[in-house]
Every structure is written in C-alpha cells, then in structure tokens.
C-alpha cells in the first residue's frame, strides 16, 4: 500500500472524498475519480518532500 496515502489526516481524507464526489457529479466514473484524486495526492506529497 501507499504509505503517503495512509498517513492522511481526517481533514485531508474528507477533502479527498469531496473532490471525488465533485468529479463524479461531472460524469467521471468513481474508479477514475479515485485515481485522479490519488494521483493529485501523490504529486502533492512528492512536491512537499522535494522541498524539504
């Protein structure tokens, strides 16, 4: 499993759920919406680690 995604705070998890729901309202499938949000989280985590 992806440790970066396992360490999300409750607030970050809630924000991710809201992003997924918004994408699904736009007609994107749930699987694709989850993948999009997960990729965004990974990219954000990677950028944060590179700045350290």
Swiss-Prot record:
Q: Which Pfam families match?
A: UPF0181 (PF03701)
Its domain of life?
Answer: Bacteria
What NCBIfam families does this protein's entry cite? PRK05114.1
Report the sequence similarity comment from the record: Belongs to the UPF0181 family.
Q: What is this protein called?
A: UPF0181 protein HD_1137
- Organism, by scientific name, is Haemophilus ducreyi (strain 35000HP / ATCC 700724)
């Amino acid at each position: 499993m992806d440790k970066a995604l396992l360490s999300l705070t409750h607030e970050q998890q809630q924000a991710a759920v809201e992003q997924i729901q918004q994408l699904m309202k736009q007609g994107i499938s749930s699987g694709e919406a989850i993948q999009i949000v997960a990729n965004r989280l990974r990219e954000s985590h990677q950028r944060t680690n590179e700045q350290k």
